[in-house]
Design a protein with these regions (language model features):
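Active-site and donor-binding regions of nucleotide-sugar-utilizing enzymes
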Residues: 1-176, 180-182
Length: 182
């Protein structure tokens, strides 16, 4: 389950890797165009989950709550070997909690450790009630997850695997003035 473009990108790469290990693997859930290109049939458009901030969330609260329940029911209906949620913790961890409550033996994996080391340190302990394993992007994150009972593997950050800027791209951004990113 992915709820935003960055999760779709991570999910597509994960699906490709899993398929290389087991060509018969099947994927069911929620994702965007990249995950769909890897064979996922999305339960509903991932874009429905891409909301941020109180002003955006409030009018969609009941719809999102219904989507959480639908996603958990769909996950249970297909009897997966594992439920893999990707980032979008406000949505994904609620789905995992419902699914785990209904089927305690369900293996749950969350890809992208929440930044408990930077803010909301209690989130890891709360997350450990529903998540068995975490795939961490940063090398210092596993101890935070392991400290509350989850297993955790550092899998690396996808930015590291991307190509460096070409000489022409470097020249383009190497102007005289400061670089302002907004």
């Amino acid at each position: 389950i992915a709820g935003e473009p960055s999760g779709d990108r991570l999910g597509a790469a994960l699906m490709e890797g899993l398929r290389s290990l087991s060509p018969q693997v099947q994927f069911h859930g929620i994702g965007g165009p990249l995950m769909q290109a890897q064979g996922l049939t999305s339960l509903f458009p991932m874009e429905e989950l891409s909301v941020m901030g109180l002003v955006e969330v409030l009018p969609k609260y009941f719809h999102l709550k219904r989507r959480i329940a639908e996603a958990a029911q769909a996950a249970l209906a297909c009897q997966p070997a594992a439920l893999i949620t990707i980032d979008s913790p406000d949505f994904c961890l609620r789905v995992a909690a419902l699914a785990k409550a209904a089927r305690p033996d369900l293996r749950t994996i969350h890809y992208v450790a929440p930044s408990v080391w930077a803010w909301r340190p209690g989130r890891a302990a709360k997350m450990a009630r529903h998540i068995d394993h975490v795939l961490a992007l940063l090398p210092f994150e596993p101890p935070y997850m392991q400290a509350v009972g989850m297993t955790c593997d550092f899998v690396g950050h996808p930015v590291v695997a991307e190509a460096l800027a070409t000489p022409s791209e470097t020249a383009l951004i190497a102007g005289d003035g400061p670089l302002l990113l907004a």
